[in-house]
């Protein structure tokens, strides 16, 4: 239930590529397309965040990370929060040097709001 624009600063989604643990390997598009369509219809013009995202380990994880950052940004996301935990599976970016390097490259691309950068947050909110 959307309370209305005057009560909402950002909208966000979360999603995971569970790999073989649940539904098989899924791309960012597989995981987020329906949710992105719905949230953009409900709250057009609001800044978008991917509030939680993760990917199971595998030979394609680094490519999945690169693709996900790019597709999230292309979809309008200004912020992405990685689920950096070893829980049901090892979601962490830091568990593999190649994955960590891919994430660092993707996260330093222009357009992302970075932690502690108040001016970028203000600009993303149109303030």
Segments predicted by a language model, with ranges:
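Substrate-binding cleft of secreted/luminal carbohydrate-active enzymes
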Residues: 46-127
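Aromatic side chains
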Residues: 2, 16-18, 82-83, 118
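Substrate-binding cleft/loops of secretory-pathway carbohydrate-active enzymes
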Residues: 1-12, 63-65, 69
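Glycoside hydrolase catalytic-domain groove-lining segments
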Residues: 6-59
